[in-house]
C-alpha cells in the first residue's frame, strides 16, 4: 500500500464538476492499493499519517501532528500509484489490487482514519476525479507498507 501525503492549506476533489470533498488545513492523501496489501497496512498508514509531526510549531519546527492543529484529511484513491514504468512507455498496473479488494482496503483505511478522531473527506472510488490543492511548504512524503 502506497500513500503520497501532502501538507495542505486547502484541498478539494470533484467528480463531473461536482465538489464531493474538501478540507482546509490538513493532509491530502493519495492512496494506492496493491495485491497482497492488508488491513494491518491500512491501519498502520492511518495511524502514521495522523501522528506524523509535519506541522510547524511556534518556532517554525515540524513538531505538530494533525490532531495538534485540528486539521482534517482528504483521502483519494489512486490506483496509478501501483503503476510500474520500468519497461516500455506505457505503465503496467499488474501489481494493483483488483477493484473489489482495492475498494475494501480503501474503505478500511478511511475508517481507520476516522477512528483516530480526525475529520475525513473522500473522493469517490474508481471515479474520474479532479483534485485541487494548495501544498503548504511544499511538504510531501511517500509512505509504503505491505
Swiss-Prot record:
Arranged from A to Z, the UniProt key words for this protein are: Cytoplasm, Hydrolase, RNA-binding, tRNA-binding
CC terms in the record's Gene Ontology section = cytoplasm
Disulfide-bond pairs as recorded: none
Which stretch carries the motif Gly-cisPro motif, important for rejection of L-amino acids?
A: 137-138
Give the EC number(s) under which this enzyme is classified: 3.1.1.96
Location of this chain's protein in the cell: Cytoplasm
MF terms in GO: D-tyrosyl-tRNA(Tyr) deacylase activity; Gly-tRNA(Ala) deacylase activity; Ser(Gly)-tRNA(Ala) hydrolase activity; tRNA binding
An annotated GO BP: D-amino acid catabolic process
**Keyword Lipid metabolism tagged:** no
Per its record, the protein catalyses: glycyl-tRNA(Ala) + H2O = tRNA(Ala) + glycine + H(+); a D-aminoacyl-tRNA + H2O = a tRNA + a D-alpha-amino acid + H(+)
| SUPFAM superfamilies cross-referenced by the UniProt entry | DTD-like
Instruction: Give the main localization category.
Output: cytoplasm
Database matches in Gene3D superfamilies? D-tyrosyl-tRNA(Tyr) deacylase
What exactly does this protein do? Answer: An aminoacyl-tRNA editing enzyme that deacylates mischarged D-aminoacyl-tRNAs. Also deacylates mischarged glycyl-tRNA(Ala), protecting cells against glycine mischarging by AlaRS. Acts via tRNA-based rather than protein-based catalysis; rejects L-amino acids rather than detecting D-amino acids in the active site. By recycling D-aminoacyl-tRNA to D-amino acids and free tRNA molecules, this enzyme counteracts the toxicity associated with the formation of D-aminoacyl-tRNA entities in vivo and helps enforce protein L-homochirality.
Q: Which PANTHER family match?
A: D-AMINOACYL-TRNA DEACYLASE 1, D-TYROSYL-TRNA TYR DEACYLASE
What HAMAP family does the database record attribute to this sequence? Deacylase_Dtd
Its UniProt domain note says: A Gly-cisPro motif from one monomer fits into the active site of the other monomer to allow specific chiral rejection of L-amino acids.
* NCBIfam families referenced in this protein's UniProt entry, alphabetically: D-aminoacyl-tRNA deacylase
State the oligomer form and interacting partners: Homodimer.
Family according to the record: Belongs to the DTD family.
The protein's name in its UniProt record: D-aminoacyl-tRNA deacylase
Organism, scientific name: Trichlorobacter lovleyi (strain ATCC BAA-1151 / DSM 17278 / SZ) (Geobacter lovleyi)
Amino acid at each position: 500500500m502506497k500513500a503520497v501525503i501532502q501538507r495542505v492549506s486547502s484541498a478539494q476533489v470533484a467528480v463531473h464538476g461536482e465538489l464531493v470533498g474538501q478540507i482546509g488545513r490538513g493532509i491530502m492523501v493519495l492512496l494506492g492499493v496493491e495485491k497482497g496489501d492488508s488491513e494491518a497496512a491500512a491501519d498502520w498508514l492511518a495511524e502514521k499519517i495522523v501522528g506524523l509531526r509535519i506541522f510547524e510549531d511556534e518556532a517554525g519546527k515540524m513538531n505538530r501532528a494533525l490532531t495538534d492543529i485540528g486539521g482534517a484529511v482528504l483521502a483519494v484513491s489512486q490506483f496509478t500509484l501501483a503503476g510500474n514504468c520500468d519497461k516500455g512507455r506505457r505503465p503496467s498496473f499488474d501489481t494493483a489490487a483488483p477493484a473489489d479488494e482495492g475498494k475494501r482496503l480503501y474503505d478500511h483505511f478511511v475508517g481507520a482514519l476516522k477512528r483516530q478522531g480526525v475529520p475525513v473527506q473522500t473522493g469517490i472510488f474508481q471515479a474520474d476525479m479532479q483534485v485541487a490543492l494548495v501544498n503548504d511548504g511544499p511538504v510531501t512524503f511517500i509512505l509504503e507498507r505491505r
